[in-house]
Amino acid sequence: MGFLTPMHELGEYLKWTRSGEIQLPDFQRGYKWEDERIRQLLVTVLRGHPMGAVMLLKTGNSQVRFKPRAIEGVHLTPGTEAKYLLLDGQQRLTSLTQALSGNGVVATKDSRGRLLDRRYFVHMETALSDSNRVDEAVISVPADGVVRSNFGKDVVLDLGDQDKQHEHGYFPLNLLYGDFMSWILELQNPAPGKHFHD
C-alpha cells in the first residue's frame, strides 16, 4: 500500500465534499469547531497561507470497510458513494465546506458552548486597504445577516440581502468559490470587487 501526496486547490475539495466524493468514516467524531476558530481559518484562506494537511483513504478496499456519512451540512442523495474517506482535517474541511459554499450558514458554537448558526463576510475596502487588516475585515454574523445590540432591539449592521451587502461593502464568503462574479457586477463600482477576488 503506497502513499500519495497530491496537491489540490481548495475549490476542488469543496466540490468533492458537496458532491459526496469525500465523506467521513463512521468512526469520526462530530463537528465541534467554535465560531472564532472558523473565522480565523477563513482569514488564513484569504491570506493564502497553508492550513494544514488533509488525509484521505481511497474507498473500495475489501479489507477496510467503514460506513461513510456526509460531511456535516452537506445533504446527499441516499446511496451516494464516497470515493474517499476523510481521516484527518475533518474540522477544517467541514468548516470551509459550510462557510464557503451553499448558503454559507455554519452550525457552530460560541466560546461558552452555546449553539449558533453563523455566516461569514469580508469587508472588501478594509481587506484591500492593507494585507495586515484581513483579520479585521472578516466578520461573523448571525445566519439572518443582521447584527443586533440592546438585547436584539437595535440593528447595528444589516447584511440580510444582497442590496444591503453592497451598500455596506461586505462580500459573502459563501460566494468566494461560487457565483462571486454576479455579486461583484451588481456593485455600483465593481472594480474593487474584481480586485478583491483576484
Where are these regions (language model features)?
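Basic- and aromatic-enriched surface patches that contact anionic nucleotides/nucleic acids
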Residues: 2-35, 39-198
